[in-house]
Amino acid sequence: MEPTNWLEAARQSIESRFMHILRAKDHNLATYVTGRLANLLLARLPESTASALIGLLPEGDRNKLSQARGYFDTSIGYTDFIEKTIFSMGCPNEIHDEISRAIADTFLRTISEKIPMELKLRMAKDLPMELKARMNLSQTIETKAA
C-alpha cells in the first residue's frame, strides 16, 4: 500500500472546516480531537485492518496510535464518535450535537477518501452499517462491484 497520512488529512480537514470553533478553545484542539477519534476507529477495527491503517502513517504517528491498540470492540458505533468528539472538545455543555456530528462526519469521510481501495473494502466488511454510510463505504462496494 502506498503511504498516505490519513490522520493529518483528517486533522487539516477538521481544522479548516471548524477553525472558528477549535481556535477559540485551543490551537492544538484539532490534533487532539483527531487523535482521539483515530484511536476509537482503530479500536473498532480487527487487528489486521487496524494495523494496515496504521501502516499508512509516518513513523511518529504510527508509534502514537499503535500504543492505543490491543482490543477489538465491536460495540463501538457512530454515537461513540459523536460522544468522543463532544468530550474531546472539553466543554460538553457548550458543544452542540450538530457540530459534534459534523466534526465526526468530517473525520470519517476524510479517512475514507485518503485510504487505498483495498483497505476501504476491508473496512466496509468490518464496520457496522451506520459507520459505513458515514464514510461512504457502501458506495465503494457498489462501485467496485460494477
Predicted regions and their residues:
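General marker for long, soluble alpha-helical cores
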Residues: 1-146
